Amino acid sequence: MISDVHHVGIAVSDMAAALRFYSEALGLPVVKEGDAPARGARVALIAVGGSYLELIQPVMDGSPFARHIEGQGEGLHHVALRTDDVEALVASLREWDVPLADKRPREGFSGRLSFLAPEAMDGVLLEVVQPTPELSGGNAPTGAVTRIDHVVLRLPDVEEACRRMLYYFGVETKRTFERGETRFSFLRPGDVVLELIGPSTPADAGLRTGPEARDEPLARPSDTGEAGPRTGFIAGLAFECVGIDVLAAELAAKGYPIGEPHPALQGGRIVSVHADGPGVAGVPVAFIDFTDSPR
């Protein structure tokens, strides 16, 4: 049903500044750029290994992306999941009464797509897309940044979100653990990992990850009496890289506020760029180098 994360959408107010960071500074190619009149936006698609970043600048007041920036500021907007048959997938989602913003797939910037409604994943906006052939494979990395390693989703109920990912898309949870009052679950629909973070649930809750879990009823928004999405949001974006010390030094020399590389919990070394940096567009960005600690 779902084969990978196709792209991560970022709402930006200054496309030129965002391209200077995400394309020029990171050495990543822009593979498509143009207008999306129906959405009131200017869009640039940047290849990152086998996936993409989609930079979206609103050019029309009242567009979904203008409203996003007005209400929440620049930043991570949506995660697009790749499918080889968007018509069949959306038909299944309709049959299962999954809340949809696009009840029928439509032509979009990267292919034929449909957005789920925010309440389908407690406020995290998901898209399903069947990309055009030329936007199906990304680009082989040529610089320090090689791929999107993971996307962080912060959710009010991680266990329920994992069950929805299985129910909606057939994506199983690979690993779950708790640290203090926080629960972490990891899903890998393809090359890119989805890291779900939220409050801990009781230790005996028993997350079921096999196919049989799809037979259990979901706690839908209507069941809770809530009219709209809850508190979920896309909380961070991490790239895998090689030569992390050189990359950090180069970004610092170009004026981007970046920390010092240090050991990462998942192995390797990690460094972060401040979300308020020029062109970073409010995104918590991290770079991870697994060279000395391959996964």
Name each region found by the language model:
Residues 87-144, 181, 185-190, 195, ...:
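Vicinal oxygen chelate
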Residues 54-75, 79, 83, 102, ...:
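DNA polymerase sliding clamps and clamp-related checkpoint/processivity subunits
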Residues 2, 10-52, 88-111, 153-193, ...:
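Core segments of cupin and vicinal oxygen chelate
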Residues 51-54, 85, 236-239, 243:
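Extracellular/lumenal glycan-associated surfaces
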Residues 60-63, 241-245:
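A low-complexity, Ser/Thr/Gly/Pro-enriched, surface-exposed linker/loop concept
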